[in-house]
């Protein structure tokens, strides 16, 4: 069976090569960015930026929102997250528990309408924008990937502030979040880049590969976005075609072997 499978894959690879014309990436400079191009293509919108200069539309609602199944603060209501973020937060909470830290979800997805109400209410009360409530469309929470996480003591407090960073839970999350695809979204020394004050409780799901790169290089999501966009621009200026690269790679990756027959025989299918 192994020989048959290998032979079929070689045959299909040859057919794909002849049908596609030039070899994968032929004539293009080598792709040397540390992350795969598919991650930057962001089909799943995991690295989508939401801030004052990258506003989400008023009707933007993630398609795969689910009710969260992790431990929640008593006043959290019925928070929702995108499916991947929900799976990841459950894994992170379980790992934290094993290390002796109990985490509580305080806030997750927030609609544009809710964010607008919160922003206007605070603006009317203070008479100014103090930066503590994001402008409508600029909230990380609207992506369905941003979360506020606290320990039990802090869920009982009226408000959140940077002193939460001194807790064991905050320190554990800052050290381990990337293992589950999360980043510390608003770092203490990145206020100039993010436009948001330090929030040791706010984490953002971006996927494990991007999270590892961002956290290991101590980047804000803004800096990461600027960096990879600049790389693609320079790569294309040198003769690359990012869209064509994605298309060609998707054709190669579309060759899969699946078992669909009653007798266990393998069949090869190609999906474009």
Residue ranges of predicted features:
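Sec-dependent N-terminal signal peptides of Gram-positive bacterial secreted proteins and lipoproteins
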Residues: 3-25
């Amino acid at each position: 069976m192994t020989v048959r499978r290998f032979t079929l894959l070689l045959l299909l690879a040859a057919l794909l090569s002849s049908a596609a014309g030039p070899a994968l990436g032929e004539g293009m400079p080598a792709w040397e960015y540390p992350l795969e191009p598919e991650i930057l293509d962001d089909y799943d919108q995991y690295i989508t930026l939401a801030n004052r200069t990258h506003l989400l539309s008023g009707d933007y609602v993630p398609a795969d929102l689910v009710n969260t199944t992790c431990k929640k603060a008593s006043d959290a209501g019925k928070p929702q997250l995108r499916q991947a973020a929900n799976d990841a937060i459950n894994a992170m909470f379980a790992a934290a528990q094993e290390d002796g830290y109990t985490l509580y979800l305080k806030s997750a997805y927030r609609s544009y309408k809710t964010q607008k109400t919160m922003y206007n209410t605070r603006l009317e009360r203070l008479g100014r924008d103090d930066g503590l409530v994001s402008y409508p469309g600029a909230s990380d929470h609207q992506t369905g990937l941003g979360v506020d996480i606290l320990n039990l003591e802090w869920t009982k407090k009226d408000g959140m502030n940077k002193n939460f960073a001194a807790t064991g839970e905050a320190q554990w999350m800052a050290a381990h979040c990337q293992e589950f695809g999360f980043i510390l979204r608003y770092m203490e020394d990145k206020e100039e880049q993010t436009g948001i004050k330090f929030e040791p409780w706010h984490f953002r799901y971006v996927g494990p590969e991007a999270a590892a790169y961002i956290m290991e290089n101590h980047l804000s999501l803004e800096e990461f976005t600027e960096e990879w966009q600049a790389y693609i621009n320079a790569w294309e200026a040198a003769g690359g075609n990012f869209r064509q690269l994605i298309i060609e790679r998707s054709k190669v990756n579309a060759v899969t072997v699946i078992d669909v027959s009653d007798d266990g025989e393998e069949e090869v299918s190609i999906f474009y």
